[in-house]
Amino acid sequence: MNFVFLWAALGGAIGSSLRYFVGKVMPSKFLMFESFPLGTFSVNLIGCFVIGFMGHLAAKKVFGDDFGIFFVTGVLGGFTTFSSYGLDTLKLLQKSQYLEAVSYVLGTNLLGLIGVAIGWFLAKNFVGVN
């Protein structure tokens, strides 16, 4: 029997639970902002870093397909929250919190890309998988 869907579902349950936890422990006041979706912001940046790291290892066949499905598709798919990111941005805009909304969008995208690049670089150069 093929367990690919089970691996993805199990990983998704773990990732979603971790996302919920991070969202609950993060404050809503951040830097100069009274209301900022720091939990969603954090999980997206962490997820970008980890997917960069794991993406390099997957490309070099360091682990099998089942683990890749479990971790990348399941755990990271459940952990990162692009749909929540869109909703959080819309809510900021609806409350006329334009500076927060723009900072959130630019910060998530720029820092997310940097996180992916750093994760890839570390996996490539320090794990010894070229």
From Swiss-Prot:
Activity regulation note: Na(+) is not transported, but it plays an essential structural role and its presence is essential for fluoride channel function.
Cellular component aspect of the GO annotation: plasma membrane
InterPro entries with a match to the protein in the record: FluC
Residues binding Na(+), per UniProt: 77, 80
Subcellular location: Cell inner membrane
Keyword terms: Cell inner membrane, Cell membrane, Ion channel, Ion transport, Membrane, Metal-binding, Sodium, Transmembrane, Transmembrane helix, Transport
GO biological process terms on file: cellular detoxification of fluoride
Transmembrane portions of the chain: 3-23, 38-58, 67-87, 102-122
Membrane topology, from the record: Multi-pass membrane protein
Catalysed conversion reaction: fluoride(in) = fluoride(out)
Recorded GO MF terms: fluoride channel activity; metal ion binding
Entry function: Fluoride-specific ion channel. Important for reducing fluoride concentration in the cell, thus reducing its toxicity.
Entry similarity comment: Belongs to the fluoride channel Fluc/FEX (TC 1.A.43) family.
Official protein name in the record: Fluoride-specific ion channel FluC
Organism: Helicobacter pylori (strain HPAG1)
Encoding gene per record: fluC
